[in-house]
Amino acid sequence: QKESTLHLVLRLRGGMQIFVKTLTGKTITLEVEPSDTIENVKAKIQDKEGIPPDQQRLIFAGKQLEDGRTLSDYNIQKESTLHLVLRLRGGMQIFVKTLTGKTITLEVEPSDTIENVKAKIQDKEGIPPDQQRLIFAGKQLEDGRTLSDYNIQKESTLHLVLRLRGG
């Protein structure tokens, strides 16, 4: 009796398969749940491939996936293919100073886009990216550009200005 109930619960939750394609062209199949975090997925890749999570960058639909988010947050469904890029050098830290004087520390890569950086700020502070304006060396930073495009290096400080709705 107990067993059949458990079985039913598992069937209802239902896992799904996704594929992870590496730069060498190898495809790894993973069993996941929509509620799995990206961190969980990286742990599964480590189990299969022995690659430490901190060396993994996962890309889906051109976006780099953030550890704290879930597969369903990114609308990753069964049979979706993620791309795995290895992060060889360590990342770097940058600082983001808000108007209230608070300083946020972020782990980034020179190849991260401004959009990625805004997503990281959202994860830490809960501020939606469309309300964020980032300023560096007096310039407003464009979403599609990367940190290296602006010559933003480790320990650089960006300034965060909030864009109020409308206007």
UniProtKB/Swiss-Prot annotation:
**Key word Cytoplasm present:** yes
**Positions of the site: Interacts with activating enzyme?**
69, 87
Misc. comment: Ubiquitin is synthesized as a polyubiquitin precursor with exact head to tail repeats, the number of repeats differ between species (up to 12 in Xenopus). In some species there is a final amino-acid after the last repeat. Some ubiquitin genes contain a single copy of ubiquitin fused to a ribosomal protein (either eL40 or eS31).
User: The Ubiquitin-like domain covers which part of the protein?
Assistant: 1-15, 16-91, 92-167
Q: Which UniProt keywords apply?
A: Cytoplasm, Isopeptide bond, Nucleus, Repeat, Ubl conjugation
The family database entries (PANTHER family) matched by this protein are listed as: UBIQUITIN
Q: What is the name attached to this protein's record?
A: Polyubiquitin
Q: Where is this cross-link: Glycyl lysine isopeptide (Lys-Gly) (interchain with G-Cter in ubiquitin)?
A: 21, 26, 42, 44, 48, 63, 78
Mention any one GO cellular component term assigned to this protein in its UniProt record.
Answer: nucleus
CDD domains recorded = Ubl_ubiquitin
Q: Which Gene3D superfamilies match?
A: Phosphatidylinositol 3-kinase Catalytic Subunit, Chain A, domain 1 (3.10.20.90)
Which locations, inside or outside the cell, does it occupy? Cytoplasm; Nucleus
Instruction: State where it is primarily located.
Output: cytoplasm
Where does cross-link Glycyl lysine isopeptide (Gly-Lys) (interchain with K-? in acceptor proteins) occur? 91
Q: Does the keyword Iron-sulfur apply?
A: no
Q: What does this protein do?
A: Ubiquitin Exists either covalently attached to another protein, or free (unanchored). When covalently bound, it is conjugated to target proteins via an isopeptide bond either as a monomer (monoubiquitin), a polymer linked via different Lys residues of the ubiquitin (polyubiquitin chains) or a linear polymer linked via the initiator Met of the ubiquitin (linear polyubiquitin chains).
Kindly list the residues the record flags as site (Essential for function). 83
Indicate the family of this protein: Belongs to the ubiquitin family.
> Which InterPro entries has this protein been placed in?
Ubiquitin-like_dom (IPR000626), Ubiquitin-like_domsf (IPR029071), Ubiquitin_CS (IPR019954), Ubiquitin_dom (IPR019956), Ubiquitin_ubiquitin-like (IPR050158)
